[in-house]
């Protein structure tokens, strides 16, 4: 299975990674084009475009200015250890063994507004450029136009290399829109996670994000090769509910947290 997840806004470039093993992003030429566009923006432009505070806008203007390949362990960090957020809390990369890292490299990909598609151990430098940003660029008026079919082609390439034809979408809608579903060369599975609140099961964003990370880790660890095997997922109290599920959207429920 090939798992797709979103990146995180929160970054950690302070703590050292647990391994020196690293790879390079495959779409750095395109990233450089976007950096060149972003360097034309003033902090005020960035604040307006990204709807962020002046402080965060200034930080990201500096990041765009400082962004500079080649990436090394001195000026960059592996994506899976740099991203911090609910999905990454669930994934818990800081406790990966060497064999689990190798499995992650094969079965996990991170969608990114700046880098397109990342392997977990790809080095990245700090940035903030969400996929939904309406950044005018040489290809159009937003990042979906910029990336076009490029990300989809890389997803298909990774899918072939990992051995089966199942893509598990654990990314947000904003990021998954960068993938052309009609061009995917495999079957697409989009798990749904619902938590019980006041007697009703519904998708609760915070819990669902962490659950996506838990499932990504489960796939990396257990290497399922069928949707049926995926339904055995049972981390942190979730369980498969056949009645609410469809063949392409397995539903996992969790009873109310006490």
From Swiss-Prot:
Top-level taxonomic group: Bacteria
InterPro entries per UniProt: YaaA
A single cellular component GO annotation: cytosol
Pfam families per record: H2O2_YaaD
Coiled coil: none
A GO BP annotation: response to hydroperoxide
Assigned protein family: Belongs to the UPF0246 family.
Protein name: UPF0246 protein Sfri_2896
Native source organism of the sequence: Shewanella frigidimarina (strain NCIMB 400)
């Amino acid at each position: 299975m090939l798992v797709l997840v979103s990146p995180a806004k929160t970054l950690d470039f302070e703590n050292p990674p647990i391994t020196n093993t690293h790879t390079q992003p495959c779409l750095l030429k395109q990233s450089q084009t976007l950096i060149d566009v972003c360097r034309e923006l003033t902090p005020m432009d960035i604040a307006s475009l990204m709807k962020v505070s002046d402080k965060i806008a200034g930080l990201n203007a500096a990041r765009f200015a400082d962004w500079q390949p080649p990436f090394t362990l001195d000026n960059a960090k592996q994506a899976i250890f740099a991203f911090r957020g609910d999905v990454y809390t669930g994934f818990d990369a800081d406790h990966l063994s060497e064999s689990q890292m190798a499995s992650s490299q094969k079965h996990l990909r991170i969608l990114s507004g700046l880098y397109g598609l990342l392997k977990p151990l790809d080095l990245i430098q700090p940035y903030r450029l969400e996929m939904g940003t309406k950044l005018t660029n040489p290809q159009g008026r937003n990042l979906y136009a910029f990336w076009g079919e490029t990300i989809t082609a890389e997803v298909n390439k990774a899918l072939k290399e990992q051995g089966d034809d199942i893509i598990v979408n654990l990314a947000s809608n904003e990021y998954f829109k960068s993938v052309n579903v009609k061009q995917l060369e495999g079957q697409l599975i989009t798990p749904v996670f619902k938590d019980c609140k006041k007697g009703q099961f519904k998708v609760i964003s915070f819990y669902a994000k962490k659950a996506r990370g838990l499932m990504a880790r489960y796939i990396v660890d257990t290497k399922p090769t069928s949707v049926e095997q995926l339904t055995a997922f049972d981390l942190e109290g979730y369980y498969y509910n056949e009645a609410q599920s469809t063949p392409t959207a397995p539903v996992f429920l969790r009873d109310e947290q006490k």
